[in-house]
Amino acid sequence: MINRQAILHRPLSQYAYSTAEYCLTIRLRAANNNLCSCVLHYGNRVDLTPLDKFRTLKMEKIASDDYFDYYEANINSDLDRVCYYFEMQDADERLYLCADTIATDFPEDRTEVYQFPFIRREEISDVPHWLKEAVVYNIFPDSFADSKRGISCTAKDYFDEKIGQTLHTRLGGTIRGIIENLDYIEDLGFNCLYLNPIFTAAEYHRYDLLDYYHVCPNLGTDDDFRELVSEVHSRGMHIIIDGVFNHSSWYFFAFDDVVKNGENSRYKDWFYGLKFPVVRPEDGQRPIYTCFAYERKMPKLNTSNPEVRDYFMDVCRYWLEDFDVDGWRLDVANEVDKDFWRAFRAVAKKTKKDSVLIAEIWENSERWLQGDMFDSTMNYEFRKVCRDFFAFGKINAREFNSRFVDMLLRYPFPIVQGQLNLLDSHDVSRFRSLCTQSPSVAGDFSTVDKRFRLAELCLLTSVGTPSVFYGDELGVVGFEECDYRAPMPWANPVKDNRDLFRELIKLRRSNDCFIHGNFRVLDYDERGKFVFARATDSKRVVVALNAFNESNDSFSVLPDCEPIISYNYDAQNHALGAFGYAIFEVK
């Protein structure tokens, strides 16, 4: 019997979306191993063709998790208005899914089946093509460099007379330091930079912004940044900057005016939750105004206020137009007014059509990825599932598969291709440090780098845009903020993984399967075996890994050819040793 409770289809969602004019992707969920076939029937929703004369497509099972199988079909036709229904069959019965009704009888009328009203160009699911092809190097400016292959590790505070505030640093990194090390970044294979905040701010992290129109003097000048952008573009690379529009510094001109003038301030409606008189609390005191978290120095902006919106729309345009940056990573995006983001997107795309907008949202982001706000989000879910499988070893490959499939099917596939996958960032512990936390390590740290290597392999071969935090290639570690934002160890790498990164990035960028190919899981077990394929119409790449501290000889699905990259692989027995991997190219 077909398990009716497991059947799911949601129209106009990640289960039914357009990828081009006259092209639709349709998905269906069913119980594990329940259906023996699934057929999609589709036709023109505005003509009179009988429903039993509809065109048909056999749906492919594209993924399975612990409970469900997922089927998919791609409609490439001459239709821009489509209606459709599903025919499902197991050994005992045939059922039809028609507009959320499961029936044993054939549907009789178009009003009884699913509708895709019209494939509108502006609603086609996609991201700028260059984002799919990007391999991102994320730089925390204060920590990276102030010279070629060097950083002073010296705080160089600066008193800004115009603002009347001291601007702090911790390690002394500069824009000039980034310019002088572009050869290093390019040599590793990265083709996109993402910089944490560079605008004028009081603290070294620069998430408490004082001036949105200038580079922080501690980092350099506006002209230094123009030079950086020019140098990046001359190498065929892209550059993304950090935008902090959820909150500002408590010495930002508008909030400073509120403190000074109270209810008479023309900016009193620029901020959330003000109680007059507004005072700046002492350290340890909770503010009486709304902030980012409870950070007293970061009052929350009222982004639904038209004046606030207009101010930051100009900031958006200014950096895209005057400095020619290629996109924005947008801080605390899920706390900002959604109409603000819709307006922001309109300005960004009008100013620079292929600019990208990446939201900092740590959870499910369906609501923000409908094509009216963001192109992408920072995919912390990728980090979490890799942490639990590779670093902690607390889930097996079956559980890893289930969570990975959920992540991959959460959005339309073109949106998944642009998700910013990461293992660490300025906000979380270094992944290599997490690899010391597995119970199986137990004082034996010989597996730490092997676990880290497998995670990087997964990052650079999976669907999505990989992002690497500066210094991961040199073994930077750290659980606490001051440690995971450590100075770049130019002279004394903790662990030199540059060859690994070069090899994997070169493989990714030279093989279209990793950029535009689909993703199919081929095999997994209850231990550490995980095998997947990335494929285009003309080529297929198979990636096999063993995230377990024992050899595994059950890799029967591997191609009968030499791997292009491997570690601890026994070709004769189709076996992978502890933490081994192999990548095969099949033409």
Q: Which residue ranges define each predicted feature?
A:
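Aromatic- and glycine-rich beta-strand/loop motifs that create alpha-glucan
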Residues: 32-79, 89-103
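Non-catalytic, glycine-rich low-complexity segments
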Residues: 1-34, 107-129
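The substrate-binding groove and active-site-proximal loops of carbohydrate-active enzymes
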Residues: 162-176, 208-221, 295-309, 326-335, ...
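Substrate-binding/active-site clefts of carbohydrate-active enzymes
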Residues: 134-136, 140-191, 198-317, 321-322, ...
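C-terminal beta-strand-rich structural cap/linker in extracellular carbohydrate-active enzymes
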Residues: 32, 82, 572-587
